[in-house]
Amino acid sequence: LHIVANPAAAFPAQAVTGRSLRQQRVAWGVLLGAFALFGVLCIGTGLGLRYFLLDSTVALQGMLTVGRGTVGLTSTDLIEQVVRGSREIANSSVISTDRQSQAMLSFYDPHTPGELVATITVRTDTALDLAAMSRPRFELSGLGYEITLNDLAGRLKVIIPDDLTREVRVTIESQAGNWITLTGSGEYFLEVSPNLEILTNYGGSAAMIAADGATTQLVADTQRALRNPETGEVYVVPAPVSLIQQPQFTQATVIESDGTPAQLLQPAWRCYSVANGDPTGDFNIVRENGRTALQMLRGGGARTHGETLCSRALNAGQGVDVTGFDTLSLDVLFKINSHSLSACGIEGSECPVMVRVDYVPVGGGPATSWFHGFFVTFDPNITNPLVCASCTQEHEVVNAGAWYSYQSDNLFSLLPANARPEAIVNVVVYASGHEYDSFIASAELFGGIRDPLPAPFGESGEIAADAP
């Protein structure tokens, strides 16, 4: 047996040193790799946490309310349903109206119950895909509200309130692939067809963007832009003129009428009630479904005629000359909860919502009025007329408890040539009948001029002056 006296002699120094270096390198590699992985995890976690806190989103609460007729709704299950009342909707909902129906899309902030972010009126013969609606997950995020609509064909009215703490951005894609963006509080009117895309802006910021993103046309306040989808040409003209200053019904714009001429100088709705017997109707500014509106209410089992009226004098009661306009149209936003009479009463003059325009006809004849009414209840066993003696059109039936955006035809075309308005003196909205419960949010009057359009838009220049 041979015993090595010096163990180190069995392991040369060079071999020991090489192995030690390799071990050290492996150890350092593991340590540095772990540190790098730790750093990556920290950065990734930080970025993920930042995204979650600042950039992640949740869906808005979306409500579909049918104001008239029935509306088609196709959800993610691809089964088309027919909706008459109200129901909650989600992303990727396809909505369509026919020639007689209208719907309203209302978007609410789920973190602040009742806070209305935007409303979109879907007018007749319109289809769209609600692609997305979102808000930031947490309040500390600086993101705004986002609503995206795809494949629009038809007409919309978009309202973004002015009392929100976050920016609202509505993005709309036409069936031709062009884009429209709406940002900031305001009122926007859109009309999209295969031959023409129209955007009208009152109060907000808007833009038309080509499908390829190559061109962008900004549309300022009180402007209207028309795009030819085939050529991409965009033509900008003045929007129809809003003839009523501050048309909304708010605490600042509604006063109780005292019958004095001094009130005519105020840009306000002068409201009052009359009745043939107790009780007298009442009016109050309220918050209804997230919007400010005037409620006109008469209950108590009333069996006599009564009215609650709000009148707006134009130009301090002297009237506004409209002879320079080619079109004249009303846009009224209202809701009827209920009324006791069938239709509009035995003479067709007691509707729970009626609109009256007082005007001086051409030639300076005696002042006259144009009327139009709306109702929700009709008893087929009671043969009340659907038109009043002074009306040019039948009254309209709308759905109970639903906001409805009425847009009139051109008033000039509804009246005979010798009765065409020369000056508008008053615009009046009122509830009439026995019992009634109605709301008015706004009443607008627009005057438009038919400007000739350039060649890319064809020969029909009338579109430039149509109602918003």
Regions inferred by a protein language model and the residue ranges of each:
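N-terminal intrinsically disordered, acidic low-complexity segments at the extreme N-terminus
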Residues: 1-17
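Flexible, surface-exposed loop/linker segments and immediately adjacent secondary-structure boundaries
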Residues: 13-18, 22-99, 106-230
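Beta-strand-rich interaction surfaces with strong enrichment in secreted/lumenal proteins
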Residues: 85-87, 93, 314-322, 383-400
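Extracellular carbohydrate-recognition regions
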Residues: 217, 227-280, 443, 449-461
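Extra-cytoplasmic beta-strand recognition segments
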Residues: 249, 312-363, 408-413, 443
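Short carbohydrate-recognition loop motifs
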Residues: 277-307
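Extracellular carbohydrate recognition and processing domains
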Residues: 364-419
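Extracellular carbohydrate recognition
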Residues: 398-405, 415-454
